[in-house]
């Protein structure tokens, strides 16, 4: 859990923004999204393979020169 020091001299909005940024950096939001539903290991591999294929196709399109 990210921790921040709240300075009483600064507005609360700045501290809240810093906390949100720290949570984003720690990956808490992504972790919650991932744990919302259970995904079987085979499904994880299938998703990863599909992402790798699409990434390779994108790289091939980008590197193709006329």
Curated annotation (Swiss-Prot):
Molecular-function GO term, any one: structural constituent of ribosome
Lineage of source species: Bacteria, Pseudomonadati, Pseudomonadota, Gammaproteobacteria, Thiotrichales
InterPro entries: Ribosomal_bS21, Ribosomal_bS21_sf
Region (Disordered): 38-66
Transmembrane segments: none
Descriptive protein name: Small ribosomal subunit protein bS21C
Family annotation (Pfam families): Ribosomal_S21
Keywords: Ribonucleoprotein, Ribosomal protein
Gene Ontology annotations of biological process type: translation
Family named by the database record: Belongs to the bacterial ribosomal protein bS21 family.
Organism: Francisella tularensis subsp. holarctica (strain LVS)
Gene Ontology annotations for the cellular component aspect, listed alphabetically: ribonucleoprotein complex; ribosome
């Amino acid at each position: 859990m990210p921790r921040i020091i709240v300075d009483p001299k600064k507005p609360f909005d700045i501290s809240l923004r810093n906390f949100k940024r720290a949570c984003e950096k720690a990956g808490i939001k992504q972790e919650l999204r991932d744990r919302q539903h259970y995904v079987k290991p085979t499904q994880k591999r299938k998703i990863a393979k599909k992402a790798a294929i699409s990434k390779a196709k994108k790289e091939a399109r980008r590197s193709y020169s006329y």
